[in-house]
Amino acid sequence: MLLEFLLLIGISLSTACPSECRCAGLDVHCEGKNLTAIPGHIPIATTNLYFSNNLLNSLSKSNFQALPNLQYLDLSNNSIRDIEETLLDSFPGLKYLDLSWNKIRYVPKLSTAPNALVSLNLVHNEISRLDNDLVSHSPYMQTFLIQRNRIQSLPHDFFNSRMVPTLKTVKMAGNPWSCDCRMVNVKQFADSLFAHSNQNIFIVGKCFFPKGLRNYVFRNLSIENLECEKPEYSKTDDGMFKMSCPNNEMEGYHYDSIFLENNKEARHTAHFARDKDGSLLSNGQFTRNYQCAFYRQKQSIHMQKKMQASSSTEPPITTTTMEPMTTSTMDSMDTTESVVTMTTMPEIDTKIVFEHKQLDTTSRDGETLELKCEASGEPTPTITWLFEKQKLTESRKHKLTKNGSVLKIFPFLNTDIGQYECVASNGEESKSHIFSVSLKESEQPVIIDAPMDTNATIGQQVTLRCNAKGFPVPDVVWLFEGIRIPRRNTRYTISDNNIELTIEKVTRHDSGVFTCQAVNSVGSAVATANLLVGAELTEKVDKLLDDSTIEKIAKEAKQKVEKALSSTKDQQRMDKIESPNDLSKLFKFAINLKKVDLGKAREIYEESIRLVQMHIDNGLAFESAMISPNVSYEAVLPVSYVQTLMEKSGCQTGQFAESCEDHCFFSKYRSYDGQCNNHEHPWWGVSEMAFMRLLPPRYENGFNTPVGWEKGKRYNGYEVPNARKVSRVLIGTDETTPHSHLSAMTMQWGQFIDHDLTLTAPALTRHSYKEGAFCNRTCENADPCFNIQLEADDPKLHTGLYQKHPCMEFERNGAACGSGETSPIFQRVTYRDQLNLLTSYLDASGIYGNSEEQALELRDLYSDHGLLRFDIVSGANKPYMPFEKDSDMDCRRNFSRENPIKCFLAGDVRANEQLGLMSMHTIFLREHNRIASRLLEVNENWDGETIFQETRKLIGAMLQHITYNAWLPKILGKATYNTIIGEYKGYNPDVNPTIANEFATAALRFAHTLINTHLFRFDKDFKETKQGHLPLHNAFFAPERLVSEGGVDPLLRGLFAAPIKMPRPDQVLNKELTEKLFNRFHEVALDLAALNIQRGRDHGLPSWTEYRKFCNLTVPKTWSDMKNIVQNDTVISKLQSLYGVTENIDLWVGGVTEKRTADALMGPTLACIIADQFKRLRDGDRFWYENEEMFSKAQLRQIKKVTLSKIICTNGDDIDRIQRDIFVYHGNSTQFYEPCESLPEINLNMWTTCCDAMCSSSSTLARNAIGGDEKAKRRKRRHHHSKKSCHDKGKRRKSGDRWNHSNDICVECMCHDGEVWCKTNNFCKSQV
């Protein structure tokens, strides 16, 4: 049973929604219901709870059951007076508590131990006293608000220095503050907070007492101003010693005297008595140095004169009759005070005071001018800006920040010279301040630190400096041989201030003239430096090599690579496929021939360089000082030889360029390979192009060898750790924790979308080019082999299979030939970049493919109805994906022989990877055909091509909408999503959507931390199916299970009705992935974590700390710095033992061990990379669904109704209930599942046209006539596919003919595109 299963994994959730409230996901809304008590049975998984605008009058722990996941509690606008102590013990995860606009008088201690509060709002209550530990028990507190209460002073040490790093905003104005010695601690803390960051806000407001400081702004006072009274000493008639406080200012007030020692209420050891006037009486003399102050009350106060029980939530009331006071009584004076009922608040002056006045200033032409005016008052005033008596409003030129108190003008011009006025008003008063801005003379740049001529050896690091002065501050630009050096994606590193240019490993190609140019609006200055690299060595190399030698080397390299590729294919055909691991390798090497050629060219080129090295080493006896270690020998070759090797390898050919002349088609529909999307940057986002990089790569030789290639090499004093060891020590876990409120579909959608965006070109061969050995038969690092060594204590060695070659097989991914740029900089040494075989755009290419050939293979061209083809259907008569026919990828070669079938065919070659992914591909094939059929009904004038393209366009829009509106905010957290991605503001052709290497190779692989040990399978009643849940290692490449074990429904229910694994730094990857990946019986398993780490090194990704710097995050220099980033001492200790220094931590490892950001599934570094990528994917896509040119407003409204839940309901076999937000997990209760018919549905009538100009047929024919290009010819040929005839047992059948196979009425056959297709009739299936 489902309930039993959930209990087994530790989940027991009460999810009933209170009848008085409305529940939406994990939010419970009970606002404005006139509630006088908290309703019971609040769902235990609740994260946000809203009780504002009710009639609640008290809060106690008995009102709430424990809500461990509660993060936000809104109790504003009630009548709450009493709060029970330690209330927050019931909400250990509560971060935001809003108690504003109530009638609270005293706030007690809220928790027994430090709590998780980030924000506490107590605005507009009747609070006169706060517990001493209220804020100090909240170590994560960032915002504390107590404006408009009745607080005269705060307890001593209410704020302490430990709060300085976290507390950002404190607002306490509107209280009748007594600015005396009791406030010294507050003043000291405020000064510390501002010293820590001038962005912090700490507002106390104005003093009310003493009279001499009334209406003074607290912030402007010095500590010397905060004085208390000196007591007066006397002796009574009966011999008692008396200490009293002068009451010169107390006319019109009741008051209590308070005696202090060192600014803190005094604790006494002697026996005292309290006189009726508040003085202290003692039998002996007062020996300590006391001060005194008052707790003041107005004449209209009704005082309660009776001592209350100490158990009250408010402080007990002191007596006014004279009686002996014991030590314990005096000790209680620290925590007791008169409780009063005040009929009116002390009047606070509404006078506006300018806290900061902008002085007359000057500015230079073209710079940014910042003007500042700050004012205080009650109510808080607003600032308005005027220039020459004309009001200034927000614009591109004028920016208002900090609630209008700061005005930024850019660019400042002559027309901005004149008189400015800032006006502060609060509805009761208005004040203004006038000042002038004049023009300051500009200065032409002068270079004060010019670069110097330099001689360097090959492989040496060279840094050139260029510093300049002038006004405006000049920008420094670097050029090489007259061509500007870009900041990113070259071997040159330019410092943040542009002053330094660093070349990591210089080559002979860097010899030349470097220029620095300092430029501002006035003029420019130029300085040059000559760099000469390896003159002696390059002279010898030029004598050793000639054109014929280079030709021979290129030919030999090509033969070696082609031989290795041929051997791999031969072995592939001979190998016995006994496991998903074997099948995975088969898929890996069965890629499109064109893509093979693209990758092979780079492999030939790199092998040519290795042969050049051998030739030079054998022919020259040069000293080691002439070339630095770990430098590619490409660095010593002349440019002409490099170009020859590139030409001979095939590296100078690239992607076929689409003409994009068919404006009708490409204005409405995407190309398959991403071309014709961005007309200004035609290669951005295109398939079969290199990934872009956020940071320059870190290769061991600066060219192509990964970190760890040379054994024993140290980085920052330490060797990089073995990838498998990192996985064993840090990553793998036997224990997993289920997520409290996100479903397993969160992970599955991530994989589905990833396969739409990234597919790195794999290695072409499993043979070493150098020795010809299989990669699994050597542990040497020899391209393409980069195997992972197994250490002596590794359990994998116990199998005996690794005894001879104790390493895990790993081939390097293929490489791109180059960037395609033509500048001299890029014709020199180019580091190794990897190839993305897919389009970068989120365009449903995983469904339709990345080329027209793929799309035609997937389409049903017989009917010309725009459908995707299929071969078999489910019991519900809904199609499965078609089978592969002509590929080497044959899932019948898998171990499972009881129901062998071929692999399914989809737009992405990985569709068969696991059953959950197969289900998603199946659902979207069905959704395509459903939409296409409906579009044909409402548009009888459309041909099949138009229907197909319109459906493809709509499916792509659906994927975009689901991803950005439902999925991304959950994985990134709403705050990160809103900050980095934000609202869509239109297409920008200057935004590069190309997938970043860091995103594909590390960041998006965070999703591996979400994978469960099993694929859950539930029946219609949400109970485990008779086949049971499927261990993950049995779900790979098993399409027969999809067909024979219940179809897609059990798997889909398992995705939306079960939770994902919780990502935790101490539970990163379950051991199904680190110890059993692709495992089957005797087969030795792979390790996904080790593969991720090794792949990051293969791709030359810099360390994790470099990306923290890139994302403007704090960069840990020491291991103690890690405590605020990882927040798990055990994990930090393991990282230290593995890496030695923080600078060596791999990006993926650092990313998955960081503390997760609020509401996110990852830490800030990976979130930064992922959010940056998805923002670029959206903003740089001309076909983005919200671009007003793509869909009509009516169509867009319909698209925004789309949910993945509805798509699954519509296309599942028999799914009738589902949650509205499919990514939210609601525990073991089905009450959150809604009937499918209640979910919103897209209205396809909005796509009805009567006379729409179609691009499909006419424009296709036009393109054939104009260009005659191969792609257009293929489009034309599609209309003739249906004319092919078939031969069946000697009979010739026309295309479209149907007949019974061998007169068997249960089997119907059809001639389609020259092929015979047969299926079993449904009525026969039901009989069976």
Curated annotation (Swiss-Prot):
Sites carrying sugar chains: 34, 77, 220, 403, 455, 630, 776, 894, 1112, 1128, 1228, 1300
Enumerate the residues binding Ca(2+). Answer: 756, 839, 841, 843, 845
Q: How is the cofactor bound?
A: Binds 1 Ca(2+) ion per heterodimer. Binds 1 heme b (iron(II)-protoporphyrin IX) group covalently per heterodimer.
Q: Which reaction does it catalyse?
A: L-lysyl-[collagen] + L-methionyl-[collagen] + H2O2 = [collagen]-L-lysyl-N-S-L-methionyl-[collagen] + 2 H2O + H(+); bromide + H2O2 = hypobromite + H2O; L-lysyl-[collagen] + L-methionyl-[collagen] + hypobromite = [collagen]-L-lysyl-N-S-L-methionyl-[collagen] + bromide + H2O + H(+); L-tyrosyl-[protein] + bromide + H2O2 + H(+) = 3-bromo-L-tyrosyl-[protein] + 2 H2O
GO MF terms held by the record: heme binding; lactoperoxidase activity; metal ion binding; peroxidase activity
The record ties this protein, via InterPro entries, to:
Haem_peroxidase_animal (IPR019791), Haem_peroxidase_sf (IPR010255), Haem_peroxidase_sf_animal (IPR037120), Ig-like_dom (IPR007110), Ig-like_dom_sf (IPR036179), Ig-like_fold (IPR013783), Ig_I-set (IPR013098), Ig_sub (IPR003599)
The Gene Ontology CC terms held by the record are: basement membrane; extracellular space
Residue limits of the Ig-like C2-type domain? 346-438, 445-532
* Residue ranges of every copy of the LRRNT domain listed in the record: 17-45
Q: Where is the signal peptide?
A: 1-16
User: Keywords of this protein's UniProt record, alphabetized?
Assistant: Basement membrane, Disulfide bond, Extracellular matrix, Glycoprotein, Heme, Iron, Leucine-rich repeat, Metal-binding, Oxidoreductase, Peroxidase, Repeat, Secreted, Signal
Q: Which cofactor does it need?
A: Ca(2+); heme b
Q: Where is the composition biased (Basic residues)?
A: 1273-1295
- Gene null: resulting phenotype: RNAi-mediated knockdown causes no neuronal defects. Furthermore RNAi-mediated knockdown rescues the neuronal defects of the pxn-1 mutant (ok785).
Which residues are heme b-binding?
754, 913, 1008
Chain residue ranges for the region called Disordered = 305-332, 1266-1297
Q: Where in the cell is it found?
A: Secreted; Secreted, Extracellular space, Extracellular matrix, Basement membrane
Domain of life where this protein originates: Eukaryota
- Which pairs of positions does the record mark as disulfide bonds? 373-422, 466-516, 660-676, 775-785, 779-807, 1111-1168, 1209-1236
Kindly name one Pfam family recorded for this protein. I-set
Predominant location: secreted
Record's PROSITE patterns?
IG_LIKE, LRR, PEROXIDASE_3
Spell out the Low complexity composition-biased ranges: 310-332
GO terms, biological process: axon guidance; basement membrane organization; embryonic body morphogenesis; muscle attachment; negative regulation of axon regeneration; regulation of basement membrane organization; response to oxidative stress
Role description: Catalyzes the two-electron oxidation of bromide by hydrogen peroxide and generates hypobromite as a reactive intermediate which mediates the formation of sulfilimine cross-links between methionine and hydroxylysine residues within an uncross-linked collagen IV/COL4A1 NC1 hexamer. Required for embryonic morphogenesis playing a role in epidermal elongation at the twofold stage of embryonic development. Required post-embryonically for basement membrane integrity and muscle-epidermal attachments, and specifically in the function of basement membrane components such as the type IV collagens.
Name of the featured protein? Peroxidasin homolog pxn-2
Q: What is the source species? A: Caenorhabditis elegans
